Amino acid sequence: MERKGLAARSSGNPSPPALGEGPRPVPPPCVPSGGGAPERGQAGTAAEPAELIRRAHEFKSQGAQCYKDKKFREAIGKYHRALLELKGLLPSQEERDARPASSAGVPKSSRLSEEQSKTVEAIEIDCYNSLAACLLQAELVNYERVKEYCLKVLKKEGENFKALYRSGVAFYHLGDYDKALYYLKEARTRQPTDTNVIRYIQLTEMKLSRCSQREKEAM
């Protein structure tokens, strides 16, 4: 708004030059300076991967502390900030498939060492798992979003117990009992004695049994 005000004030007729003065030179157009805090995209472009990873790890740690303090909304914000720092460091599977082998540009991921790539993926997995955990603490749970985050984890780490279990819970509450049972049974193969998994499997099987009974009655 300040720039607009300046433009409005400078658009009026300038005062005539004093007697004996020549024509006044026309001032150059105002060009925004490069000062001030850079936007996230600019910072992300300029920062080295090691610095982005360090900041992401710091935000993730802050999110974990907020979760312990039961400040779930703040924790969600911290985990999102962590993921934002890592955005673009690891290409998605679609990007990897679409990128030609002789690409002229050097992607950010090529600047990562093997250890850095593993660290980035581990942080992403932790953040998505933690986001799902935070959402499940809400009074009104967004199970669609819980499912989304858990499936992101499973794309990277298909045997992740927490993501399997929470996927099953999300699908159960979304009414997709077949998928719920699949993910819950997958979770049970990782931790056969987990009481929460066993309880949700029982609940899901009861729902499926009722659905089957209704279908028979309808016939």
UniProtKB/Swiss-Prot annotation:
This is Tetratricopeptide repeat protein 9A. GO terms for biological process: bone development. PROSITE patterns: TPR (PS50005), TPR_REGION (PS50293). It comes from Mus musculus. It holds the Pfam family TPR_1. TPR repeats lie at residues 56-89, 125-160, 161-194. InterPro entries: FKBP4/5/8-like (IPR050754), TPR-like_helical_dom_sf (IPR011990), TPR_rpt (IPR019734). Residues 1-49, 94-115 are annotated as: Disordered.
